[in-house]
Amino acid sequence: MNPNPPVFVVDDEEPVRVSLSKLLRAMGYPTQSFASATAFLESEAVSEHGCLLLDLRMPGMSGIDLIEELTRRQLAVPIIVMTGHTDMKSVQRLESFPLVGFLEKPFSVDQLRELLDRWRFGT
């Protein structure tokens, strides 16, 4: 039995999903990845206790749209947002949500580990 709760990777880019999933497993986290926000919402993972590693810009439902939908459904999912395209409008929209943290792509393993530790241990 794995002592770490799962991390759910939601990103429309397959290479990102694959590499993050491998990295997270190497760090001891069970993972499940999703190619879209809609796929995550339609899965059983949405009701599991875990952390969401979420890309902001995706076709269809964006990462911000997913955060808003989870909030509307009153699902308190810990979320680490990642993006390669930071814009002030998105940052301002995100300020109203209790996120674990924000990663700007490309990010380091240490940056990811720091946010996972913050989620797990409150550090």
Language model segments and positions:
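Receiver (REC) domain active-site loop signature in two-component systems and cognate sites
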Residues: 58
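C-terminal output helix
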Residues: 89, 107-119
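Two-component/phosphorelay signaling modules centered on CheY-like receiver
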Residues: 14-32, 97, 119
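Active-site beta3 strand of CheY-like receiver
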Residues: 47-53
